[in-house]
């Protein structure tokens, strides 16, 4: 799993995510993201079936497939997220990343290749 970090940029995760998605689309990537939903009890869930911890973004621009977990500054990867990323990284040809807002320059580089 490639983890890239540089200087800090103060962004909320949803703003960061929107920026990554916009840039990816601008560079010709197909983007998949399932947004979380707020339940009546005030809990956030992702309304899909599957094991918990699935990464935030799937980016496809043949021949490349990128799987991304996005984190806010100071955000931590959960054990379930780490398990998913490890399993996906073991698949041939899949690139997996954990990106923080401070990684912006490297994100631009990865998505522009």
Task: Describe each model-derived feature in a short phrase.
Residues 1-113:
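Catalytic phosphate/metal-binding cores of nucleic-acid and nucleotide-processing enzymes, i.e., regions
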């Amino acid at each position: 799993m490639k983890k890239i970090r540089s200087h800090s940029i103060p962004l909320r995760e949803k703003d960061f995510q929107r920026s990554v998605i916009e840039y990816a689309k601008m560079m010709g990537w197909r983007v998949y993201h399932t947004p979380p939903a707020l339940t009546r009890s005030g809990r956030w869930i992702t309304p899909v079936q599957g094991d918990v911890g699935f990464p935030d973004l799937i980016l496809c621009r043949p021949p490349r497939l990128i799987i991304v977990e996005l984190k806010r500054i100071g955000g931590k990867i959960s054990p379930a997220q780490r398990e998913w990323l490890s399993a996906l990284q073991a698949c041939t040809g899949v690139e997996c990343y954990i990106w923080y807002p401070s990684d912006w320059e490297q994100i631009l580089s990865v998505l522009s290749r």
